Amino acid sequence: MRNSKGFTLIELLIVVVIIGILAAIAIPKFGATKDKAYIAAVKSDLRNLSTAEESYFADNVVYTTSLPTTSFSSSAGVTVSISAANATGWTASAVHASLPTKPCFTFAGTGGPSGLATVEGEIKCTP
């Protein structure tokens, strides 16, 4: 009788196939998670911009289109732009460098609607 202390080739192949199947399932889910994190950063920046705009308005009785005049700074990779601002409202959009085709929009007061945002204060992103 033979003394076997290792794995057979078939057993090793089965393990490799199982690992391959698990990787094929996990990798696409990881990619979608990364995109969700980028969108969350963009939405967070637009919420922070809203707070900065309201703070600026409280001091100056007008909204601003200039980001340096507010206390706002965006997250890494996020570009925020204020397309319109006056004494009664403002409109802004933001996009992450890794998702350039999925911008998000928001507005306040008479600044909107903007992009997909149709309700004041709501942040809407391109699906």
Model-derived features with residue positions:
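Aliphatic-rich helix starts adjacent to a transmembrane/signal segment
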Residues: K29-L46
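N-terminal single-pass transmembrane signal-anchor helix
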Residues: M1-F30
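Periplasmic/extracellular, small/polar-rich flexible segments of pilin-like filament-forming proteins
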Residues: R47, T51-P127
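Conserved catalytic core of two-component sensor histidine kinases
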Residues: V16, K43, S50
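Short, intrinsically disordered, low-complexity terminal segments
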Residues: G20, K34, G89-T91
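Regular, well-ordered alpha-helical segments
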Residues: A24, A32-D35, T51, S55-A58
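Compositionally biased non-globular segments, especially hydrophobic aliphatic-rich helices
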Residues: E11, A40-K43, E120-G121
